[in-house]
Design a protein with these regions (language model features):
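Secondary-structure transition motif
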Residues: 1-148
Length: 148
């Protein structure tokens, strides 16, 4: 972490701080695909549990075995996001505008160290079309596996 010169500076009291670059997983311009609980068949017909509709209404004889979002292939994705901003902030710095959009429920704040006020990464995004995400005409655009 420190070279010899820096170790000496620490020992002599001349160095009391260090800075390191934060390595964030996403950057503005990255395209994410959203994985979700899903089911698909051999003819590329996909249904999504988030729709809340009946599987029978989608043509299934019975309720399908839902597949976990972690196993969703990109070709089954229907939601694509372009990252517009990435930053770090303190948990308690969530502003009133962002309160409605936070992932952490007020009842669960104790689980995430609210009182400790940890640093969190904030990823802002905009929804884009599948065609735009894949580079038009069904081409393969630059996409990054997104959270499920």
């Amino acid at each position: 972490l420190f070279n010899i010169e820096m170790v000496r500076a620490i020992m002599e009291g001349r160095k009391t701080v260090t800075r390191r670059a934060v390595k964030l997983p996403y950057h503005p311009g990255d395209i994410l695909w959203v994985r979700e609980t899903w089911n698909g068949d051999w003819c590329d017909h996909y249904i999504y549990k988030a729709d809340g509709g009946s599987a029978k209404a989608a043509g299934y004889a019975a309720e399908p075995k839902w597949r976990p979002s972690i196993h969703m292939p990109r070709e089954a994705a229907r939601l694509f996001l372009r990252v517009t901003d990435v930053r770090v902030e303190r948990l308690q710095d969530i502003n009133l505008i962002a309160v409605w959009d936070r992932t952490i429920k007020p009842a669960d704040l104790h689980l995430y160290g609210w009182d400790a006020n940890p640093w969190i990464q904030v990823i802002e995004f905009e929804r884009i079309s599948k065609d735009e995400a894949l580079g038009g005409e069904g081409g393969r655009g630059r996409t990054t596996e997104g959270a499920g």
